[in-house]
Amino acid sequence: MAKNTEAQKTITVEQIGSPIRRPAVQRQTLIGLGLNKMHRVRTLEDTPSVRGMIRAVQHLVRVVDEK
């Protein structure tokens, strides 16, 4: 197997919308991203699964930084 010599890419997201009155699936997605309160910021690995979770709640989060 080939070793991954690249540095791990990260993506920083901030919660800008409230999960109140949102479907349970969207609330669970925010929890999966490590976000549960307004204006919380998390730095996550930049993987396809994380990108998909961000896309599912794009109206509730903002991408702050990509490295």
Swiss-Prot record:
Pfam families: Ribosomal_L30. GO terms for biological process: translation. The keyword Ribonucleoprotein applies. SUPFAM superfamilies: Ribosomal protein L30p/L7e (SSF55129). GO terms for cellular component: cytosolic large ribosomal subunit. One of its GO terms (molecular function) is structural constituent of ribosome. Keywords: Ribonucleoprotein, Ribosomal protein. PANTHER family: LARGE RIBOSOMAL SUBUNIT PROTEIN UL30M, MITOCHONDRIAL RIBOSOMAL PROTEIN L30. Part of the 50S ribosomal subunit. Belongs to the universal ribosomal protein uL30 family. This is Large ribosomal subunit protein uL30. It comes from Allorhizobium ampelinum (strain ATCC BAA-846 / DSM 112012 / S4) (Agrobacterium vitis (strain S4)). The lineage of its organism: Bacteria, Pseudomonadati, Pseudomonadota, Alphaproteobacteria, Hyphomicrobiales.
